[in-house]
């Protein structure tokens, strides 16, 4: 099913009376100029047409800087949004606010790979993107036939940045980031006269964590709530216990087992009627005999250990000897290296269909992630060409597809208690209890080890 059709099914019932609004200036504004504590936000707008979901749509593409200020009026952060709005404007259309994850990831991945009006043409069968040029094609599966789109790059991602005197701790953190993104959303609604339009949030990977936090910020019971119609979670990570295989935390081994089975099936290491069949077998084994065996620890009887080890080998394609040496607990990093070691290959973390070759085949973990270096050059070229050459955005800043500064300085605390794993799933439940019409859509990938799909299923149940 096309992405636009999926989204249409989520928001089909959203009809509302729209309030009158002021006219919005459409002229380009100059590039940002940071002098004497003042910044003039840059705005670049182009009118375009495309066919999406079988419909011909005229739309306005706008890259704009939003300046966030301190309490005393000094600029602290410049956040870039890229919006695609149907022309002429129709305030009855939903507005879909989108962001990627990281923390530190720019919106290029969702914008140029999924929902935007253009997509970069790179192989979809897990082959390397190779050398330029990388064609930028019309995206018939964009959501522009059913919704207006706003891609947000938080500080430290994309072209967005903190001013030189801003303390990173004020923006680089779970709650600080959500507050900033929510503020940008409110300002965009102000500037575009869209307060009474249906509103959706969508995030990928850590962006799903951000979605939960921003939803809490917007609908948090402050008596100034922004009502939301839906949340779209892509490659969901809400409970981080499932991705931290620290000693004593057995959950990580349980929730990644179905991913291992899917990857082993794809690469011909296990036999099954289909990937769906092997995944379902792995699900049932993971929450049954496997979880029980891990929790028994040293009390696990030899016969039970042997039975679990044999089934684990059948599902993962790893040898019983290797599984015994790992005490039945194989981390994802080791799995990437071990699954295809006999072929001299490693597999990807973001997408286990990708394979790569390391300098040292005898190593314990991979040198790098072939599913990332297999696509990043194409996406980087696409977003820079689109923003600078097509939309005319002017900046000397490098586009941060994956910015390092946010991750280095990130504050992960939510006040849930010292030593607790981060879990934002309760905030989605809270948002749904406070808004009876809020709907949530979850999309996962069988081959995505960064955000194990079984972990997301567990979090949302």
Which positions does each model-derived feature cover?
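Glycine-rich nucleophile elbow surrounding the catalytic serine of serine-hydrolase chemistry
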Residues: 203-216
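N-terminal cap/lid subdomain of alpha/beta-hydrolase-fold enzymes
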Residues: 27-32, 73-170
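A catalytic-pocket lid/entrance helix-loop region that shapes and gates access to the active site
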Residues: 117-122, 215, 219-316
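Active-site-proximal cap/loop segments of hydrolase catalytic domains
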Residues: 65, 120-194, 241-256, 263-273, ...
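Short alpha-helix in the alpha/beta-hydrolase fold that links the catalytic acid
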Residues: 213-214, 325-328, 438, 452-461
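Alpha/beta-hydrolase fold catalytic core
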Residues: 297-450
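Bacterial N-terminal signal peptides
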Residues: 8-19
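Alpha/beta-hydrolase fold nucleophile elbow
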Residues: 193-206
């Amino acid at each position: 099913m096309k992405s636009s059709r999926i989204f249409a099914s989520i928001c089909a019932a959203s009809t509302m009376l729209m309030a009158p609004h002021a006219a919005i200036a459409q002229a380009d504004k100059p590039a940002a100029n940071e002098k004497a504590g003042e910044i003039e936000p840059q705005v670049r707008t182009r009118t375009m047409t495309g066919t999406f979901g079988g419909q011909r749509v005229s739309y306005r593409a706008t890259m704009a800087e939003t300046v966030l200020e301190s309490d005393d009026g000094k600029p602290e952060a410049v956040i870039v949004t890229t919006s695609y709005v149907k022309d002429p404007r129709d305030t009855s259309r939903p507005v879909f606010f989108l962001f990627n994850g990281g923390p530190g990831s720019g919106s290029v991945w969702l914008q140029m790979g999924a929902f935007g009006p253009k997509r970069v043409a790179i192989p979809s069968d897990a082959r390397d993107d190779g050398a330029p040029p990388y064609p930028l094609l019309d995206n018939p599966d964009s959501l522009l036939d059913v919704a207006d789109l706003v891609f947000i790059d938080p500080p430290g991602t994309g072209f967005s940045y903190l001013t030189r005197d801003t303390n990173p701790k004020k923006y680089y953190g779970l709650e600080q980031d959500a507050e900033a993104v929510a503020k940008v959303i409110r300002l965009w609604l102000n500037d575009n006269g869209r307060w009474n339009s249906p509103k959706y949030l969508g995030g990928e990977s850590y962006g799903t964590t951000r979605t939960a936090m921003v939803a809490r910020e917007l609908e948090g019971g402050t008596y100034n709530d922004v009502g939301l119609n839906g949340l779209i979670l892509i490659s969901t990570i809400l409970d981080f216990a499932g991705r931290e295989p620290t000693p004593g935390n057995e959950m990580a081994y349980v929730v990644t087992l179905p991913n291992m089975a899917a990857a082993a099936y794809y690469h011909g290491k296990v036999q099954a009627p289909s990937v769906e069949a092997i995944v379902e077998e792995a699900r049932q084994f993971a929450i049954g005999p496997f979880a029980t065996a891990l929790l028994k620890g040293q009390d696990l009887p030899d016969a039970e250990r042997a039975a679990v080890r044999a089934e684990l080998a059948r599902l993962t394609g790893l040898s019983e000897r290797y599984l015994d040496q790992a005490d039945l607990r194989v981390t994802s990093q080791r799995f990437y290296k071990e699954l295809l070691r006999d072929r001299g290959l490693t597999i990807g973390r973001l997408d286990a269909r990708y394979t790569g070759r390391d300098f040292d085949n005898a190593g314990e973990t991979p040198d790098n992630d072939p599913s990332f270096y297999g696509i990043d050059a194409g996406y980087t070229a696409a977003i820079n060409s689109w923003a600078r050459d097509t939309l005319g955005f002017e900046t000397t800043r490098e586009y941060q597809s994956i910015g390092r500064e946010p991750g280095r300085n990130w504050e992960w605390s939510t006040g849930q208690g010292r030593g607790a794993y981060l879990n934002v799933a309760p905030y989605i439940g809270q948002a749904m209890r406070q808004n009876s019409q809020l709907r949530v859509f979850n999309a996962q990938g069988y081959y995505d080890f960064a955000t194990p799909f079984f972990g997301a299923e567990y979090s949302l149940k």
